[in-house]
């Protein structure tokens, strides 16, 4: 009887210890992102608790541009980031050890113009003011190396202002610029709140992997399991965005529109979740980087070199495959 009582006491003590102890410690992991729809999977994974599902305690850190974000990865302040790969190419050409480990989103960039600016096609931008991303960003490279080129424009034919997407929208509303080259949802928001129209969308004519997931070679070597867990979480978030855009919109709408509703010019007050849902539907998210997309990445790197913005140590063409590590993608059989 005494033995039975002792066993009961011991069992109760053990149970108390188990339930009072904190849950298994999550591994800390820092991810940089931009507040644009291209990075929706990073935000959705955080808000849906997917990082925790895979054992990570993630700190999401916002940056205004990929050119700033890459510095934090090179400097060791971040474990990974979702942003344009041209930033990694530029730093890798100087010797930085960086790795593209996953896809994220295929480029959606729209040119929207004020209706009173008399801009109906890209060629009409000559002599106009255009808000875009920071110089050297993937958006900037594609704008000048593809969009302008195909329209017969030279980079200096247009006064390009490098600002954040949020400032670009404000500049359109305030008539400080004639047009803007925007991500979603800023392109959609601009058309809802200001007298502007879309005249071009690069994804329709020249699709490319705009956003990818990048980490440092050191982080991938020393924390490969954690990097892969973060990619698993973002892959799940991409499935949520693709299959349940309305549910995903409820999670991330607050990142883009502060108030519950958006006051529009023609549709009255719109729920922010409805605006973001439609923006999500316009996107092509993919964690996989296929051969076609890798070839397009090489094409963009070649444009960088042709512009003189990318110089390798030996003067040879930069090989994008030298910074691509798709071991996670292969292991997950994507």
State where each predicted segment sits.
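Bacterial N-terminal signal peptides that target proteins for export
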Residues: 1-10
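Bacterial N-terminal signal peptides
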Residues: 9-18
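N-terminal signal peptide c-region/cleavage motif recognized by signal peptidases
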Residues: 20-22
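Short, glycine-/small- and polar/acidic-enriched structural segments
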Residues: 25-162, 167, 171-174, 178-184, ...
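Periplasmic-binding protein-like
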Residues: 40, 105-113, 192-219, 223, ...
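A residue-level marker of the well-folded mature domains of exported/periplasmic proteins
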Residues: 64, 170-180, 190-199, 208, ...
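Secondary-structure end/capping motifs
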Residues: 222-310
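Conserved C-terminal helix/tail region of periplasmic/extracytoplasmic solute-binding proteins
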Residues: 297-334
């Amino acid at each position: 009887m005494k033995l039975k009582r002792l066993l009961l006491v011991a069992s109760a003590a053990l149970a108390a210890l188990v339930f009072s102890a904190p849950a298994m410690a999550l591994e800390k992991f820092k991810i940089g992102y931009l507040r644009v729809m291209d990075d929706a999977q990073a935000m959705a994974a955080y808000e849906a608790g997917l990082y925790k599902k895979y054992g990570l305690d993630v700190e999401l850190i916002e940056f205004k541009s990929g050119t700033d974000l890459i510095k934090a990865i090179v400097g060791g302040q971040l474990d990974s980031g979702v942003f344009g790969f041209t930033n990694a190419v530029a730093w890798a050409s100087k010797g930085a050890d960086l790795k593209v480990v996953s896809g994220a989103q295929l480029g959606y960039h729209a040119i929207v113009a004020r209706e009173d600016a008399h801009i109906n096609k890209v060629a009409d931008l000559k002599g106009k003011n255009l808000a875009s991303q920071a110089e050297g960003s993937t958006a900037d490279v594609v704008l000048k190396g593809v969009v302008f080129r195909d329209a017969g424009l030279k980079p200096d034919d247009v006064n390009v202002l490098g600002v954040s997407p949020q400032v670009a929208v404000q500049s359109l509303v305030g008539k400080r610029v004639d047009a803007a080259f925007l991500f979603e949802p800023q392109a959609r928001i601009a058309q809802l709140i200001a007298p502007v129209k879309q005249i071009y969308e690069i994804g329709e004519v020249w699709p490319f992997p705009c956003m990818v997931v990048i980490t440092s070679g050191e982080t991938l070597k020393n924390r490969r399991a954690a990097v892969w867990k973060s990619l698993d979480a973002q892959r799940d978030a991409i499935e949520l965005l693709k299959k349940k855009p309305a549910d995903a919109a409820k999670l991330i709408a607050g990142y883009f529109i502060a108030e519950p509703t958006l006051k529009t010019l023609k549709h009255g007050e719109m729920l922010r979740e409805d605006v973001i849902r439609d923006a999500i539907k316009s996107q092509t998210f993919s964690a996989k980087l296929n051969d076609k997309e890798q070839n397009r990445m090489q094409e963009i790197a070649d444009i960088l070199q042709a512009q003189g913005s990318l110089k390798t140590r030996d003067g040879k063409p930069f090989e994008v495959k030298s910074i691509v590590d798709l071991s996670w993608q292969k292991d997950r059989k994507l």
